[in-house]
């Protein structure tokens, strides 16, 4: 069995001033459904880690907890965070980086449960490409062999000041390079794979299954920036805003119980999880099976979030540490 890992959380962008049209409705979430279940509206971004929330639906875990969970795809994590903070969504998917960016801007959110991440022994793997579903990839005939060689080069990302940029910048700094000398450009993943194959960019920051597509086209992985940055623990999170944490604490606790159960099931039943991941991402099953597989943590630990907070400040992506504490984690005692 493949070593399990998380699914990408790298679709985030750096700001919150984004359209919320993708959230599907401007009305506030409804409290209950016709069958007496409490309804929670949840924003996702259509990535492989969504398999766990789909498992919680299909296995009846949410229903067992008295919940009717309605999911909709938002444009990106910051848009989801803004929708959750305003009450348009009850919960939303977001990695720890956009969460910390939001907190630094005074947006109050809480982490309710883990959505994806790394196992505690992930860094001990002999091949980090089996652990990390993000990758920095150069073209087939590129002379570049190290992230250190990318000064003055052009690297594509799905968004600026977001997870892939942060993790690649961190890897470059550790290698003795200067991330400020990189020419970052924004390309969606499909365009990035094509541009890399055509030699129009020097490297691309990608996420599975696009990493596999780039390698199939002759690309070469020179860095696994995600695992090197996060090391272990939850990366993607299910977040709730002030309104939901105040108005629906019991429902959020129920959601956490159900999703933790689904996360544990997904880790033990990878075939089912991969099948759902293929459907969620509209990707051929064989491509998903040949990509690194998601790891779904069953807890959110403050220590893991603090490492990210400190790193963002050290890299200059935050003016200073947010100085988070246990109150960030919903239900923490």
Predicted regions located by residue number:
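Short, solvent-exposed loop/beta-turn-alpha elements that line the ligand-binding surface or hinge
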Residues: 64, 119-129, 227-230, 296-303, ...
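Pocket-lining segment of extracytoplasmic ligand-binding domains
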Residues: 97, 180-274
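Bacterial signal peptide processing site
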Residues: 24-26
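A local structural motif
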Residues: 36-40, 63-74, 88-90, 173-187, ...
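C-terminal motif of bacterial Sec signal peptides marking the signal peptidase cleavage site
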Residues: 18-22
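Bacterial N-terminal signal peptides that target proteins for export
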Residues: 1-11
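Short, glycine-/small- and polar/acidic-enriched structural segments
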Residues: 33-170, 174
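Secondary-structure end/capping motifs
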Residues: 246-317
């Amino acid at each position: 069995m493949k070593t399990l890992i998380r699914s990408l959380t790298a679709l985030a962008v750096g700001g919150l001033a984004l359209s919320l049209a993708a959230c599907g409705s401007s009305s506030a979430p409804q409290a209950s459904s016709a069958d007496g279940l409490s309804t929670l509206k949840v924003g996702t971004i259509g990535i492989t880690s969504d398999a766990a929330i789909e498992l919680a639906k299909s296995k009846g875990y949410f229903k067992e907890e008295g919940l009717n969970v309605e999911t909709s795809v938002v444009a990106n994590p910051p848009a989801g965070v803004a929708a959750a903070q305003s009450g348009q969504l009850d919960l939303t998917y977001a990695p720890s980086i956009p969460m910390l960016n939001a907190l630094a801007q005074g947006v109050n959110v809480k982490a309710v449960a883990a959505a994806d991440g790394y196992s505690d022994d992930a860094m001990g793997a002999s091949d980090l490409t089996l652990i990390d579903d993000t990758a920095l990839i150069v073209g087939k005939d590129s002379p570049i062999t190290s992230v250190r060689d990318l000064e003055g080069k052009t690297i594509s990302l799905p968004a600026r000041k977001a997870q892939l940029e942060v993790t690649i910048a961190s890897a470059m700094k550790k290698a003795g390079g200067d991330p400020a000398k990189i020419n970052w450009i924004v390309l969606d993943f499909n365009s990035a794979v094509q541009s890399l194959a055509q030699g129009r960019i020097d490297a691309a920051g990608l996420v599975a299954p696009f990493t596999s597509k780039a390698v199939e086209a002759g690309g070469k992985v020179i860095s696994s920036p995600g695992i090197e940055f996060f090391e272990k623990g939850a990366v993607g999170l299910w977040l709730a805003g002030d309104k939901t944490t105040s108005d629906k604490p019991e429902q959020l606790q129920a959601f956490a119980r159900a999703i933790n159960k689904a996360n544990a099931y997904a880790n033990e039943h990878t075939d089912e999880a991969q099948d759902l991941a293929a459907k969620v991402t509209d990707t051929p099953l064989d491509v998903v099976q040949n990509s690194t597989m998601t790891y779904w943590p069953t807890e959110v630990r403050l220590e893991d979030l603090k490492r990210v907070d400190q790193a963002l400040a050290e890299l200059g992506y935050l003016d200073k540490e947010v100085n988070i504490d246990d109150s960030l984690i919903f239900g923490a005692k």
